[in-house]
């Protein structure tokens, strides 16, 4: 019974870590997409990074 509890806790921890890494990855990807679109419309990179980190 104790082993099962330890296993479940470990499993849940791994799942939550994977989920947060995944969502952080999605946010980073969205930010770089934003910067690329912004630069393409003629702004400089510094302005775009500031603009995209605010949204």
UniProtKB/Swiss-Prot annotation:
UniProt key word Transcription regulation: no
Signal peptide per UniProt: 1-20
Listed GO CC annotations: extracellular region
Alphabetically ordered keywords of this record: Disulfide bond, Neurotoxin, Secreted, Signal, Toxin
Subcellular location: Secreted
Disulfide bonding pattern of the chain: 34-48, 38-52
Protein name: Conotoxin Cal14.14
Taxon lineage: Eukaryota, Metazoa, Spiralia, Lophotrochozoa, Mollusca
């Amino acid at each position: 019974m104790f082993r099962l509890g330890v296993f479940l806790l470990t499993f849940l921890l791994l799942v939550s870590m994977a989920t947060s890494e995944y969502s952080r990855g999605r946010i980073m990807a969205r930010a770089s997409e934003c910067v690329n679109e912004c630069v393409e419309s003629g702004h400089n990179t510094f302005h775009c990074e500031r603009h995209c980190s605010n949204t």
